[in-house]
Amino acid sequence: MLCYVTRPDAVLMEVEVEAKANGEDCLNQVCRRLGIIEVDYFGLQFTGSKGESLWLNLRNRISQQMDGLAPYRLKLRVKFFVEPHLILQEQTRHIFFLHIKESLLAGHLQCSPEQAVELSALLAQTKFGDYNQNTAQYSYEDLCEKELSSSTLNSIVAKHKELEGISQASAEYQVLQIVSAMENYGIEWHAVRDSEGQKLLIGVGPEGISICKEDFSPINRIAYPVVQMATQSGKNVYLTVTKESGNSIVLLFKMISTRAASGLYRAITETHAFYRCDTVTSAVMMQYSRDLKGHLASLFLNENINLGKKYVFDIKRTSKEVYDHARRALYNAGVVDLVSRSDQSPPSSPLKSSDSSMSCSSCEGLSCQQTRVLQEKLRKLKEAMLCMACCEEEINSTFCPCGHTVCCESCAAQLQSCPVCRSRVEHVQHVYLPTHTSLLNLTVI
């Protein structure tokens, strides 16, 4: 079965999968060809029969979700946006940048005039390199998609000149840094109508749910802690919210189709799980529905039969779990230099690099590769001794009666259930581990 997958830069990829393949099979093949290990940040989108943008459920068959016959047309998109310094791979960062660039040019991200000037210069640097008087004005107008005033153009030119020697990768990273500070970063928008038929936009993001008018002017913002429940029935999505008075109110959102309503319901549940939870619960992972054939088979044959089973959600890991999983995968693959980009100075232009940078006087007899391996082992050792909740203080408390020792005293006192086995905590016992870092005298080479 053939699938055409379009990247954010409009490059088309042909992907051949089995006729009964799930969406995950297609996404994994795309990411493998792009050299991306951080697959969990991405998803595949397609357009429904009524023009709505829908996420392919990666755990279900492709052919059962798409209209018509193969070849199917899909779009590779970032589903979960994270801070730039949490992205470990250059390839992943590049796809993030392409998606952000597409959103900027389409006007989906609102930025201030100062940010627009800086972003225009950075986008020109990523596409054309250092400032060139012969192509500068054309470049800026092409990127901004509008006529520029002379004062704005001069400001962009000045900014672009300051970027001389900055590599494409560094410029892309700076774009991500600027955009990640914007209010609407990482928000997925859905077109809805309220109970009175008024057109609205619902934004589902890391911090909560935004309700806006069609011009993105805000009406209300709902934080996740006050959301009691989200449910879907047909084309409608119901959101039960706790008011400041303590009473509950049910908000109704009407969608253009049942699949669009399912998409909003999925977005609320999966986004909350990804950004706000320690792990994806089994209640989310195992929620499914059955078609008629599968329902009959479960009644008369076996309740656990997979026939006709369609999973509601496809999220597998939270943001923290994705980061940890990617670090382990990259380390096992031999990629050990995973220092955060925020801790490095921006890489210079390849034309200005020097061959002398290959030698290092601080390694004291060890090769740079050996030094990096030891530094990574040391980092993992220190990290293993940190509280899994705050990742700042050292582990010094045991949960009873389960016996898991994974948190510091302050975090353990706030937990009612063990974050590892989910069993109820009756009391917390302070412990003195012989692996305290001060006793080990750990220092970086």
From Swiss-Prot:
An annotated Gene Ontology molecular function: ubiquitin protein ligase activity
Keywords: Cell membrane, Cytoplasm, Iron, Membrane, Metal-binding, Transferase, Ubl conjugation, Ubl conjugation pathway, Zinc, Zinc-finger
Any Gene Ontology CC annotation: plasma membrane
Effect on the protein of changing residue 387 to A: Loss of ubiquitin ligase activity
Pfam families: FERM_C, FERM_M, FERM_N, zf-C3HC4_3
Coiled-coil portions: none
Zinc finger (RING-type): 387-422
Top EC class of this enzyme: transferase
UniProt PTM: Autoubiquitinated.
Cellular localization per UniProt: Cytoplasm; Cell membrane
Pathway annotation: Protein modification; protein ubiquitination
Activity modulation comment: Can bind 1 iron ion per dimer. Iron binding seems to decrease LDLR degradation activity.
GO biological process: cellular response to low-density lipoprotein particle stimulus; cholesterol homeostasis; negative regulation of low-density lipoprotein particle clearance; negative regulation of neuron projection development; nervous system development; positive regulation of protein catabolic process; protein destabilization; protein ubiquitination
Biased composition (Low complexity): 342-363
PROSITE patterns: FERM_3, ZF_RING_2
Subunit structure as annotated in this protein's UniProt entry: Homodimer. Interacts with the E2 ubiquitin-conjugating enzyme, UBE2D1 (via RING-type zinc finger). Interacts with myosin regulatory light chain (MRLC) and TMEM4.
Protein name: E3 ubiquitin-protein ligase MYLIP
Gene that specifies this protein: Mylip
